[in-house]
């Protein structure tokens, strides 16, 4: 319930910054609900330490978030593959569709409140909102369900001193970066690893270094 409340609050704050807030099935101007949004933000800031403590995860728990057996992940995966799906033949085409859906339909929200919590795939798709880490874990889980055991979530330090989550993998001799928080084609960030890492950017910022990466089977920290 705590995670759902936070997600709902972040979703309404995000919508308000785009000019409108959803209340039931009606849309009203953001200023009409300004008090409610301020209260959400105040509560999140006030209880941020408690939330962060509650949301702490062990390495094992972090790895387990990349879950191909999750029913929501499986359902999402099935939307983009045919019955005769082959990892070798059809993987990149399926990823292209998944990437287009997630980047186009799920609203990326970067909270300006110091909160560290993780949404489940079901919560992300219920509210159609998530931060970069939530979205990266969801994408990596779908890639895992498509048969990609090399895909990993990476938390990177950017050259503007922020952090950003993305997904890396290798397929048919090519290195890929997938970032579903921004719209891009599957091959925009693909090729030799050094070239891809130097070419990738998020809102004008480039990767300075990897902090840590993980998937279902591995966790590696670089700090």
What is the role of each PLM region?
Residues 1-223:
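A structural boundary/capping signal
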């Amino acid at each position: 319930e705590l995670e759902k409340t936070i997600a709902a609050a972040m979703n309404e704050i995000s919508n308000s910054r785009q000019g409108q807030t959803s209340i039931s099935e009606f849309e009203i101007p953001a200023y009409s609900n300004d008090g409610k949004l301020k209260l959400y933000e105040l509560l999140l800031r006030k209880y941020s330490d408690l939330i962060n403590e509650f949301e702490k995860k062990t390495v094992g728990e972090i790895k387990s978030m990349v879950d191909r057996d999750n029913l929501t992940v499986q359902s999402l995966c099935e939307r983009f593959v045919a019955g005769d799906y082959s990892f070798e033949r059809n993987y990149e085409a399926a990823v292209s569709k998944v990437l287009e859906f997630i980047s186009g339909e799920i609203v990326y929200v970067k909270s300006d409140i110091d909160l560290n919590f993780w949404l489940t795939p079901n919560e992300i798709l219920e509210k159609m909102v998530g931060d970069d880490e939530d979205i990266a874990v969801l994408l990596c889980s779908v890639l895992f369900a498509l048969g990609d055991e090399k895909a990993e979530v990476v938390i990177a330090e950017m050259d503007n001193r922020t952090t950003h989550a993305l997904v890396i993998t290798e397929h048919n001799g090519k290195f890929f970066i997938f970032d579903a928080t921004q719209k891009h084609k599957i091959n925009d960030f693909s090729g030799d690893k050094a070239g891809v890492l130097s070419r990738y950017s998020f809102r004008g910022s480039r990767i300075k270094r990897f902090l840590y990466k993980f998937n279902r089977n591995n966790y590696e920290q670089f700090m």
